[in-house]
Amino acid sequence: MKGNIFGQKPALFVLFFTEMWERFSYYGMRVLLVVFLVKVAFGDSPWDRADALALYGIYTGLVYFTPMIGGILADKFLGYRKAVLAGALIMTLGHAAMAMEVDWSFYLGLALLIIGNGLFKPNISSIVGQLYDKEPELKDGDYTIFYMGINAGAFLGIMLCSYYGESADWGYSWGFGLAGIFMLIGLIQFYFAQGIFGRIGLAPSELAAYDASTGSGSQEGGLAKAEELDLPKISQGDGQEGPRAIRWAIIGTVIAAVVYGLIISFMDPQVNALQTFSRQFMPPIIIGSVVAFVGWIVSDKSLLKIERDRVWSIIVFSFFIIFFWWAFEQAGGSMT
């Protein structure tokens, strides 16, 4: 894994292209979603714009929510690599389902994309971070290159999928299908290049077996122990994850119920079911879940001070960046 491509490790460029094709598929599909619903739908009468935006809002909200779950699953059970592979496969199937342009397959496709994104998005970034655990000074350049792939994929996806999707000679099936084809390319590339990562991204249950078979331990693959970097050891949990999860789930549910009550007290009762779910249920579900998730983390008594401070920093930054992404996602909705 010694760096020999622009001074970076070859594994970084595997992740670069995998993420690039995933972002191609995401933004390529997104640019077509609302336009397809208001112009074509499923061969019946097109949707009202308000309904299309409501569906887009539900989809986008869940796309941003599910990575919290996907990250936990990867950390505790799957490992980052398996999560990325599973997410890429599920998203490929989702794009294929949407390309059929049938109502049931369209909704199934959106559901698969939401689930796949939750598994894929947080965990490929985690693999990028682990590449330079023993060389933290190189991480800035590492992530700069990685995000160049994100931007390149988004640009190409928007250009090509919109061209084929809105072309009279091709149609929306080709636009949605093209997104799936490039997601499949990313999946295949990552699957066959796994050997280059060493032990990085393996599931917790696989690490001991890998180290025993190679005799490498943490020295291979760039993973460093805390003492090797002169850092405090990472906390291992307080053994109360289950009770804390239940307690904060209850708190999150109560908060969600309060937010729901406030929303319906100001809302027009005549809106249809889709808009009702988008406006009444999605905000409290997301807000309640985020509060429960954050509370579950910060209430861990085993957290070191440096870890707790970093968690609070993430929470503060996340709050303010919400407004950026809220405006950014209008590109696929109200600005389409």
Task: Identify the role of each PLM range.
Residues 31-53, 271-275, 331-336:
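Short amphipathic helix-loop junctions that connect adjacent transmembrane helices
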Residues 86-107:
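C-terminal ends and interior cores of transmembrane alpha-helices
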Residues 1-10, 134, 165-336:
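Intracellular loop-helix junctions on the cytosolic face of multi-pass helical membrane proteins
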Residues 76-88, 135-136, 307-308:
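Cytoplasmic membrane-interface "Motif A"-like loop-to-helix N-cap segments
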Residues 53-74, 121, 155-157:
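Central cavity-lining transmembrane alpha-helices of secondary-active solute carriers
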Residues 94, 105-120, 318, 322:
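Hydrophobic core of transmembrane alpha-helices in multi-pass small-molecule transporters
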Residues 1-27:
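Cytosolic juxtamembrane N-terminal segment immediately preceding the first transmembrane helix
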Residues 30-31, 68-69, 152-167:
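A gly/Pro-rich, aromatic-decorated transmembrane alpha-helix motif that marks the paired
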